[in-house]
Every structure is written in structure tokens, then in C-alpha cells.
Amino acid sequence: MPTIQQLVRKGRQDKVEKNKTPALEGSPQRRGVCTRVFTTTPKKPNSALRKVARVRLTSGIEVTAYIPGEGHNLQEHSIVLVRGGRVKDLPGVRYKIIRGSLDTQGVKNRKQARSRYGAKKEK
């Protein structure tokens, strides 16, 4: 516990909150160009081939972004929209690609949670 004199001299220091999506620079989304599309394996208890893409954003920063949903049409030089949101079992992946916008197509035959995957309503 500090003395009053110590508080007069130094004062309390505010806690600094760490930014979870620094590459977006305060924007809700950012456009970018895919430089590499590949698959990675998740951390220990899980096993899969997760689809990810290396994306160069308009802010000039290159990030790794997850491609959600089943199947995708992305390849090198595809223009994508990136949002924040990490993937818990992929270390270093702190961004997600928005399906159904720019060059990214929505998920086919999606019945539930369609808006998250850019899927149109079936007639």
C-alpha cells in the first residue's frame, strides 16, 4: 500500500488495454488481397485441416485470416473483406474472412445461420 506522499509524487497508473485486432486500425472491416491460400492443423486435442489465407490488407499489414464454412473459391489475388475474431485452436489467426462479399462466395446449401456465411435464401 503506497503512502499518500508516494501517491502525490507518482499517482496511479491506468491499465492499458491491449488491442486484439491491431491490423484493422480501428476499422470494423478491412479489404485485402490474398497472397497465399493454404490449410493448417489445429492445436493439440483437435484434428483437422483448417482453411486459412495470408492476406495483405489496405493498411499494408499482412495477416493470416480464417476462411469459415464448408468449401471456398478463394485463390491467390482474390480480393477479400477481413473482420476481427480469432480462431481458438489456430495460433496466430486473429482475423476471419467475410463470406459473400467481394470475391468470396457464400456457402452453398446453407440452411441455418445463413447471414454469417453469405448464403442466399432458398426458394
Curated annotation (Swiss-Prot):
**Gene3D superfamilies associated with the record:** Nucleic acid-binding proteins
Tell me the domain of life.
Bacteria
List, alphabetically, the PROSITE patterns matched.
RIBOSOMAL_S12 (PS00055)
Specify residue ranges for compositional bias: Basic and acidic residues: 11-20
Q: Which GO terms describe its molecular function?
A: rRNA binding; structural constituent of ribosome; tRNA binding
The reported result of mutating K43N is:
In strain: STRA1; streptomycin resistant mutant which does not increase antibiotic production
UniProt entry tagged with the keyword Nucleotide-binding: no
Record's subunit section: Part of the 30S ribosomal subunit. Contacts proteins S8 and S17. May interact with IF1 in the 30S initiation complex.
Family assignment from sequence similarity: Belongs to the universal ribosomal protein uS12 family.
Query: What is this protein's function?
Result: With S4 and S5 plays an important role in translational accuracy.
This protein's name: Small ribosomal subunit protein uS12
